[in-house]
C-alpha cells in the first residue's frame, strides 16, 4: 500500500509511505525519504501487537532528529578519519559531518535524500538513488538500490546494491534502532549475543586507534548471551564513548545464513536474530539518543534504543590491512550487502 502525506519533505513534495504485510500479521512501514524504516509491528503469542523500532510521530518529525532513525546510510556508513583517504597514491578529501571526520556519508548523506520507488507490493519495495561525481567529496557517479522484503517468518530482508564509474569506498547500511520491549524503556535490560571474537577500540571521536582487539576477558565479550547492563561502562573503551558504540568483526565472515547477533527483550516475549553478509556489526547502545523525538509526548532518553548496523569496519578506506573484504568498489563491479532482521514472538 502506498500513501502520500499532506506534510511536505524538504524538496517540497509529499512523503510517500509504504506498508508491507505478511501472513503472520506483521506490518512494516517505510518512507521514500531516506529509504527509511519507520515501524515494525509484531503480533505476540498473547494476542497483543508490539512495536519493535524507534520512530517519530510523523514523517516530518524525522527532520528534527540527528540519530539517523531507521534511515539508509551511504555512500559510506560510520566514520572516515579526518574526512580523507588515499587511493592509488591520490588523496581524496570528503565533506566532514562530525567535527573533522565524516560520519555516515557526509552532511547530506543518503539518509537526507528522496529515493525513487522503482516497484512495490505488499511484500517488498525497491528504492533507487543516483549520487553524482563529487557528492560529499566522493569520486564517481554512483547508482544505488535498496530492496526491503518482508517474509512470512517475520524477517525484514534488506539488500543494498551499488555500481560506480570511478573507484570509491562503498559501505551502505540501515540505521534502525530496536527496543524489543515496545516502549520508551532502557535497552540495557535486553539480553544480547554477538558472535564475534574481535572488536575495534575507538577514541572519543569514534575513530579506531589501536587495531582489532580480542573480546576475551573484556566487557565486549558477547559470545555468550548476557544482559547489556551487566558490564556497561566497565572499561575505558566504553567510557570514552558513554557506552557501546563499537564494531565487532563477525565469526560468520560474510555467511548470511549464520546468526551474527541475537537479542532478547527484557520480558522475553520478543527476540531478534540478525543475519548479514557484511563482515562487521556496529553495536550502538543509544548513548546519545536523549532529546530525539519519539512517537509519544516525551522524547527518547539515552539508552532507549540499540542499533546493530551491518557494515565494513569504520575508517576502512584508511586501513587496507584489516582482515575483511576490500571496501573499494570499482567500475564493472557490483556492491551487494544483505542483512536480515528476524523477529521471533514468544
Swiss-Prot record:
Biological process according to GO: galactose catabolic process via UDP-galactose, Leloir pathway; glucose metabolic process
GO cellular component entries: cytoplasm
Compartment(s): Cytoplasm
InterPro entries per UniProt: Ald1_epimerase_CS (IPR018052), Ald_epimerase_bac (IPR013458), Aldose_1-epimerase (IPR015443), Aldose_1/G6P_1-epimerase (IPR008183), Gal_mutarotase_sf_dom (IPR011013), Galactose_mutarotase-like (IPR047215), GH-type_carb-bd (IPR014718)
Catalysed reaction equations from the record: alpha-D-glucose = beta-D-glucose
Main location: cytoplasm
Pfam families, A to Z: Aldose_epim
Binding site for substrate: 79, 245
Keywords, alphabetical: Carbohydrate metabolism, Cytoplasm, Isomerase
Protein name (database record): Aldose 1-epimerase
Gene symbol of the encoding locus: galM
Amino acid at each position: 500500500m502506498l500513501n502520500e502525506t499532506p506534510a511536505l519533505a524538504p524538496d517540497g513534495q509529499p512523503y510517500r509511505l509504504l506498508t508491507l504485510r505478511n501472513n503472520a500479521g506483521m506490518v512494516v512501514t517505510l518512507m521514500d525519504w531516506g529509504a527509511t524504516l519507520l515501524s515494525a509491528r509484531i503480533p505476540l503469542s498473547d494476542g497483543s501487537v508490539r512495536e519493535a523500532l524507534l520512530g517519530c510521530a510523523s514523517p516530518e518529525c524525522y527532520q528534527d532528529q540527528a540519530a539517523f532513525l531507521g534511515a539508509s546510510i551511504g555512500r559510506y556508513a560510520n566514520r572516515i578519519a579526518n574526512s580523507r583517504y588515499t587511493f592509488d597514491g591520490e588523496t581524496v578529501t570528503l565533506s566532514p559531518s562530525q567535527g573533522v571526520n565524516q560520519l555516515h556519508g557526509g552532511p547530506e548523506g543518503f539518509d537526507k535524500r528522496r529515493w525513487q520507488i522503482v516497484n512495490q507490493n505488499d511484500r517488498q519495495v525497491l528504492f533507487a538513488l543516483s549520487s553524482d561525481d563529487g557528492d560529499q567529496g566522493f569520486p564517481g557517479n554512483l547508482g544505488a538500490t535498496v530492496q526491503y522484503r518482508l517474509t512470512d517468518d517475520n524477517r525484514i530482508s534488506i539488500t543494498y546494491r551499488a555500481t560506480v564509474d570511478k573507484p570509491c569506498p562503498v559501505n551502505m547500511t540501515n540505521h534502525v534502532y530496536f527496543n524489543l520491549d515496545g516502549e520508551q524503556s532502557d535497552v540495557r535490560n535486553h539480553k544480547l549475543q554477538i558472535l564475534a571474537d574481535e572488536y575495534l577500540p575507538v577514541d572519543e571521536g569514534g575513530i579506531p586507534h589501536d587495531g582489532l582487539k580480542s573480546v576475551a576477558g573484556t566487557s565486549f565479550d558477547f559470545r555468550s548471551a548476557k544482559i547489556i547492563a551487566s558490564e556497561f561502562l566497565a572499561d575505558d573503551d566504553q567510557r570514552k564513548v558513554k557506552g557501546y558504540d563499537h564494531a565487532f568483526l563477525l565469526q560468520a565472515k560474510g555467511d548470511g545464513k549464520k546468526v551474527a547477533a541475537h537479542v532478547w527483550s527484557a520480558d522475553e516475549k520478543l527476540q531478534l536474530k540478525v543475519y548479514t553478509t557484511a563482515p562487521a556489526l556496529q553495536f550502538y547502545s543509544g548513548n546519545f539518543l536523549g532529546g530525539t523525538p519519539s512517537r509519544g509526548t516525551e522524547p527518547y532518553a539515552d539508552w532507549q534504543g540499540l542499533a546493530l548496523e551491518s557494515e565494513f569496519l569504520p575508517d576502512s578506506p584508511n586501513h587496507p590491512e584489516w582482515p575483511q573484504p576490500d571496501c573499494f568498489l570499482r567500475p564493472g563491479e557490483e556492491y551487494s550487502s544483505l542483512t536480515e532482521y528476524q523477529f521471533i514472538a514468544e
